[in-house]
Amino acid sequence: MYDYKLGIVGAGNMANAILNGILRTGVVSPEKIVVSDIDDKKLEIIKNQGVNTVKDNKVLFKNSEFIILAVKPQVAKVIFRDFEKIENLKIISIMAGITKDTLKGFFDGAKVARIMPNTPCLLGEGACAIDAGDFDDDGKTLVFDIFKSLGKVVELDEKYFDAVTAVSGSGPAYVYTFIKAMIDAGCDMGLSDKISEELTLQTFVGAVKMVENRTTDIETLIKNVCSPGGTTIEAVKSFKENNLEEIIKDGIRKCEKRSKELSENA
């Protein structure tokens, strides 16, 4: 357990996921944590967990050694107005599209770590990229311990975060799209909604396990299911004829492009 005073700006879904992860793993004790938000109801729920709450961000800034910015980017500039120069401020941002340099421009002299999480963090099954290069070893370890409680973490330079946004940050939506298509196809062929969903979801869970435990490449896994003259190969042929793989890659590239545009205009 760390003895740092930790502030969390925001009390939305992701902020709550972070807070719950911290409390579940004991990274920081509740009495050392303060959360700010404008919503009294959200703060009341958080207060019941033994955590301090405030509505004034200035109070949070002055009473925290590390501050997690867990708000939407469009809210950020409003929060920045509450900032007054504080020595040795350490910012941990999960805001998409706002770079470390942009944050340093607002928080003069601050050290900044940037995190790119995704929504499965809400269930402790997220994927997080972390750039905490500004922090000393103890600060880095704190950041990694916090976000390990939300899923898997990788250390990566911020210059790759637009790609991370496109692959894992937005990735759950792509997977949901494919899952929905499979469920709908099953229903079109006479399966009930419940059965089609159950079979589809377990297929995804099992396929992920197969990929994680593979001793060969993914292309070989595909070929292992595609018996010549069989059923699977007909579906895979159709995917190839319709350029499914290129369609997916093109969508991911467009996502990366938009992420870069948002960063440049922040």
Model-derived features with residue positions:
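Small-residue helix-packing motif on alpha-helices
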Residues: I33, L60, S192-L199, L221, ...
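Short acidic capping loops at alpha-helix termini that bridge into adjacent secondary structure
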Residues: S29-K32, N63, L89, K194
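Short pre-catalytic strand/loop immediately N-terminal to key active-site residues, enriched for Gly-Thr
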Residues: V112, F161-A166, I218-K223
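Rossmann-like NAD(P)(H) cofactor-binding subdomain of soluble oxidoreductases
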Residues: Q49, N57-C128
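NAD(P)+-binding Rossmann beta1-loop-alpha1 motif at the extreme N-terminus of oxidoreductases
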Residues: M1-K55, F61, E125, C187-D188
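Internal alpha-helical scaffold of NAD(P)-dependent oxidoreductase catalytic cores
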Residues: T102, F106-K111, A127-A163, Y176-N213, ...
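NAD(P)-dependent Rossmann-like dehydrogenase/reductase catalytic/cofactor-binding core
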Residues: L201, V205-A266
